[in-house]
Amino acid sequence: MLEKDIKKILFSQEDIVTKTKELGQQLTKDYAGKNPLLVCVLKGAVPFMAELIKHIDTHIEMDFMVVSSYGGGTVSSGEVKILKDVDTNIEGRDVIFIEDIIDTGRTLLYLRDMFKYRKASSVKIATLFDKPEGRVVDIEADYVCYDVPNEFIVGFGLDYDEKYRNLPYVGVLKEEIYNK
């Protein structure tokens, strides 16, 4: 039923799991013995985080944030709002933000700077998807599974108007769906 709204599939579930496993193995090496705090940016990063933690073979802790810069459309508003902050004291902690996609970069620049101000020992960014063409600020992820074209993609947590997050793959949404 949802497939009819997808122009083309970019990454299958198998593709995503394979890349996520590779990232988990890298994080295991990079953070062995360090107990990093993984901060999942809700809602979109939930499937990525759930898959990723299965492949990290060292102690971790998790926390969650709700951050908004879209408000329901397809274009970032430019204003970052913290709707739910972390519960964990991050002072002196190694923090890894787990994000579904980096587009403009505004949200993660804001979060990175905020956590540095809160005296995190280190702040890194792991994203399933990076859209470099959309960037409007100077920020890069430390860990990227895939670079994606400047198209509106959905699935595996990515949504349009809270829909399509449950697709097990990632595809390009047909323009007529969001240009109604």
Curated annotation (Swiss-Prot):
Catalytic residues in the record: 103
Chain residues that bind diphosphate: 43-44, 165
Cofactor: Mg(2+)
GO biological process, one term: GMP salvage
Primary location group: cytoplasm
The protein's annotated pathway: Purine metabolism; IMP biosynthesis via salvage pathway; IMP from hypoxanthine: step 1/1; Purine metabolism; GMP biosynthesis via salvage pathway; GMP from guanine: step 1/1
Location within or outside the cell: Cytoplasm
Binding-site list for Mg(2+): 99-100
Family matches, as NCBIfam families: HGPRTase (TIGR01203)
Name of this chain's protein: Hypoxanthine-guanine phosphoribosyltransferase
